[in-house]
């Protein structure tokens, strides 16, 4: 990607974006900082202090500094922080992700390490790998994970591509990979529960990796027809209406929880805003979010170049009634997603990744464009 960065002058953009994100996190008012007394918020407020994390680890886990070095801050979540780093003693300085997670209950909660157990069980090209896991004291643990070179989808779009939205070709390319990852975890009877841009990273090969299984749940002990009220987890504007409304649903329909969240994510990537006019609603106003989903129509901005075929696919994912919503097989068989096969062929035939990226961000894959036109005509005739 050095070629691309040199030619579209992204180095300063990356720096500016990182500083902007850091400023957002480091300028909270005292009242905000005092809104919670747990160690998580205190830690998040201090991460910008020089050598704070290194000093903390030197005191509580001396072996960490012997084995690893942290190079830069990546992100801050609800229960901890993520840094980029590498092994000290290896000649091959492979970049790694270090996720530090704090607990309120001194790790007495059996769910505290659920993410670790899930990641150890999952082995798929579109799911991030876990390499190591260590407890630090009684209230913190860290895991060493595969690093997505180009960051999450939000950073990939805004920083690398310098865009507010993704062109349809690359949107289709990523959507297909996310669906394949979801198909795999659903076969393992796992619901991710927090599909969004921040939990989908892009690696050096321009492939996506699903990450952050901290609020995931398993349903291996249930029968397919069992009625279950699934836990209220995830990020509010990505949560499906049946979860917001505390509706019991059959376990066999559980995959549709993630598919709705994927629909919100793809809509946001395509149009730069949430569906159902959710942008102006506070994240914690769950009743208002649910009311908007129930009462607002699913509309698509007319000023965006998105095909009718793509919109038809999004309608299937964002169906309010989960019984009518796409399941994973319906989503994978949709004509729009099938177009990803053409994009993958293009990737195999190009001489370098830079050329492939330029083609997909400029919608310059003629075979895909012709395919979409033909399928659009079929869709129009059927309607």
Question: What do these predicted regions represent?
Answer:
Residues 71-78, 82:
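Protein kinase glycine-rich loop
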Residues 129-141:
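Short beta-strand micro-motifs within the conserved protein kinase catalytic domain, predominantly
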Residues 174-175:
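Activation segment signature within eukaryotic-like protein kinase domains
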Residues 100-122:
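Conserved N-lobe beta3->alphaC-helix segment of eukaryotic protein kinase catalytic domains
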Residues 203-236:
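Activation segment/activation loop of eukaryotic-type protein kinase catalytic domains
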Residues 139-152:
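Conserved short submotifs of the Hanks-type protein kinase catalytic core
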């Amino acid at each position: 990607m050095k070629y691309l960065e040199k030619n579209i002058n992204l180095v300063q953009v990356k720096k500016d974006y990182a500083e902007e994100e850091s400023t957002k996190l480091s300028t909270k008012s005292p009242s905000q900082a005092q809104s919670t007394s747990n160690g998580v918020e205190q830690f998040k407020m201090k991460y910008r202090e020089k050598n704070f994390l290194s000093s903390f680890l030197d005191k509580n886990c001396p072996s960490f500094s012997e084995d690893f070095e942290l190079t830069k801050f990546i992100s801050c979540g609800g229960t901890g922080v993520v840094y980029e780093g590498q092994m000290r003693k290896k000649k091959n300085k492979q970049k790694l992700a270090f996720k530090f997670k704090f607990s309120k209950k001194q790790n007495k909660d059996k769910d505290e390490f659920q993410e670790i157990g899930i990641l150890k069980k999952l082995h798929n090209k579109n799911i991030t790998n876990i390499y190591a896991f260590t407890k630090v004291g009684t209230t913190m643990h860290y895991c060493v994970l595969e690093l997505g070179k180009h960051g999450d989808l939000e950073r990939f779009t805004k920083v690398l591509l310098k865009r507010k939205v993704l062109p349809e070709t690359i949107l289709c390319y990523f959507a297909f990979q996310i669906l394949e990852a979801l198909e795999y975890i659903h076969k393992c009877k796992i619901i991710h529960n927090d599909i969004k841009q921040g939990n989908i990273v892009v690696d050096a090969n321009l492939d996506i990796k699903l990450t952050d299984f901290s609020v995931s749940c398993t349903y291996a002990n249930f029968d397919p027809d069992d009625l279950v009220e699934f836990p209220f987890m995830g990020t509010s504007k990505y949560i499906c209406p049946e979860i917001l409304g505390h509706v019991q649903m059959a376990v066999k329909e559980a995959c549709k929880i993630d598919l709705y969240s994927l629909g919100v994510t793809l809509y946001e990537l395509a149009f730069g805003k949430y569906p159902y006019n959710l942008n102006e609603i506070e994240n914690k106003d769950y009743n208002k979010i649910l009311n908007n989903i129930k009462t607002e129509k699913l509309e698509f901005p007319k000023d965006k170049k998105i095909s009718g075929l793509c919109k038809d696919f999004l309608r299937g994912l964002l169906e309010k009634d989960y019984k009518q919503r796409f399941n994973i097989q319906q989503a994978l068989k949709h004509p729009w997603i099938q177009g990803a096969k053409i994009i993958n062929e293009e990737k195999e035939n190009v001489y370098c990744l830079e050329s492939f990226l330029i083609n997909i961000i400029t919608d310059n894959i003629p075979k895909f464009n012709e395919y979409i036109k033909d399928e659009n005509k079929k869709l129009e005739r059927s309607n």
